[in-house]
Regions:
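Peripheral terminal and linker regions in Fe-S/redox and tRNA-modifying enzymes
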Residues: 1-299
Length: 299
């Protein structure tokens, strides 16, 4: 799994300290509920009927033993002794008093964890195959590509206020254990006849009240170009997705409404506008390729 750098650790600790200040001002009455609401949501805190709920990010479902023990400590000390793993590989605590929120965020930061982008209309936690890296039917390990997506999407300034939440799943196996057809974007890693690594790209999937499986928008996309292609899709959605109706704001509704023709015209146009970046992303010397080398196995 990806190993946090000194910068990464500094960032999550600063974010925890920032939330402590915001929470203290809210509890003191100097920061109103309307102002505090988006701030707590950006850190994974929901206010539900009986108690707050905290959603903790677990990128592509990987936890170290140290992180798991810290989560258990939070459950024992601040919750009711348990948490809930979600279908999208996050963890939720449902009974933490909000006054304990800052202490909990500090505990998470100690083990390189947080709740950033686990709620709100942004790109959510990147999910993958629960058996990634060990599955016997796996063509390519998807975890390095998940990490690239995680770093790209975290606090992306252009995609912080999308029409609706946006979910991405990646798999590199024959069996779709990541349920990629039911995500806003689904990515299937595989090798073509020439032995080249690439993605089959799906878009427009989703569950909820309108259940629609994703459609294939690119049969084979070279791995060096996958990030600029994903960015183009999200840009089209950010521009053309509905914001007037909460129930029709997901990308699946946009894909269904415009079909392939208009969406196909816009997405390549967006992709061409970023074409200068494609070559740099393909270079082994770029930071994107170094992400994979910074990922290693740990307990």
């Amino acid at each position: 799994m990806y190993q946090y750098t000194a910068f990464d650790r500094s960032f999550v600790h600063q974010r925890a300290a920032q939330f402590r200040d915001q929470l203290e001002r809210n509890l003191a009455g100097t920061l109103g509920e309307d102002e505090f609401r988006p701030l707590r949501l950006q850190n994974g805190w929901y206010i539900q009927r009986h108690a707050p709920m905290l959603r903790v990010a677990v990128p592509y479902g990987e936890l170290s033993s140290r992180q798991l023990r810290q989560l258990a400590k939070i459950a024992r000390v601040h919750d009711r002794g348990y948490g809930h793993f979600t279908t999208r590989q996050n963890l939720q605590f449902n009974w933490i008093p909000l006054v304990d929120g800052a202490d909990v965020m500090d505990l998470l930061a100690e083990v390189d964890m947080h709740g950033i982008q686990t709620s709100g209309n942004c790109i959510r936690n990147i999910t993958s195959d629960a058996l990634a890296g060990i599955a016997p039917d796996e063509f390519v390990d998807p975890r390095p590509y998940c990490e690239i997506l995680r770093q790209w999407s975290t606090l992306h300034p252009e995609f912080a206020f999308l029409p609706r939440k946006f979910k991405i799943a990646v798999t590199g196996a024959a069996e779709d254990r990541a349920a990629t057809y039911w995500h806003d974007i689904g990515l299937h890693l595989y090798k073509n006849a020439a032995g080249e690594v690439g993605f089959r790209v799906l878009a427009g999937g989703g569950m909820g009240r309108t259940q629609i499986p994703g459609i294939v928008v690119r049969e084979f996309l070279q791995w060096q170009q996958f990030l600029v292609f994903i960015e183009a899709i999200v840009r089209v959605y950010n521009r053309y997705g509905r914001r007037d109706n909460l129930y029709k704001a997901r990308i699946k509704i946009l894909v269904k409404a415009v079909s392939r023709t208009p969406s196909g015209r816009r997405k390549p146009a967006e992709t061409r506008s970023n074409s200068a970046c494609v070559t740099s992303w393909a270079s082994p010397s770029t930071s994107w390729c170094r992400i994979a080398s910074n990922s290693s196995s740990t307990d």
